[in-house]
Amino acid sequence: MSHQPTTENDNRYWIGFDLGGTKMLATVFNSQFKKVGRARKKTKGRDGMKAGLLRINTVIQEALNDADVSADQVGGLGIGCPGPLDLAKRQIRTAPNLGWDDVPVADSIEKEFKFPVAIANDVDAGVFGEYKFGAGQNARCVFGIFPGTGIGGGCVYEGRLFRGA
């Protein structure tokens, strides 16, 4: 069954991607940010960066298939990435838990799917998500600590994300 957009004028879908030390998860949302598809796999970072980039693209395609959505219907993808990032180059500088360095993650996804990609630190993305859509809605300040394969913290104050090192 195909998911229809929820407004007449906006037929775009959006993808959120969480790249973690042990798992990767893609979720497809309709224009009202209702979940309509998802896919998840183990990250297997030690298989190497090139294998990891291919695995990311596979998970995205599986999520699109689950949602019965084609890439040309997607308005964009946001990916939360571990480790220090180069936001200007849209790359992971280093992801120690994965063993990857200088990863052109946004370019790889855009080359494959032809929709825009934004990257963010995974914890920053999680905290901002809670501020915008979760427990922190209507709060002036949201601070989060995210333990996982590693640990990180983030803060949103009056709608502004404060980025760390």
Task: Label each region the model flagged.
Residues 14-18, 74-78, 142-146, 152:
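Short glycine-aspartate micro-motif
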Residues 137-165:
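Glycine-rich phosphate-binding loop of actin/hexokinase-like ATP-binding domains
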Residues 1-14, 115-117, 135-142:
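Nucleotide/phosphate-binding catalytic cleft detector across ATP-hydrolyzing
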Residues 22, 82-85, 148-150:
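Short glycine-rich anion-binding loops that position phosphate/pyrophosphate groups of nucleotides
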Residues 55-71:
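Conserved active-site "lid/cap" helical segment
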Residues 8-58, 91-94, 161, 165:
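Short glycine-rich, Thr/Ser-proximal phosphate-binding strand/loop in the N-terminal lobe
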Residues 30, 87, 156-157:
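Short, acidic, Ser/Thr-enriched surface-loop or helix-capping motifs
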Residues 49-57, 73-77, 83-141:
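Glycine-rich phosphate-binding loop and adjoining helix at the ATP-binding site
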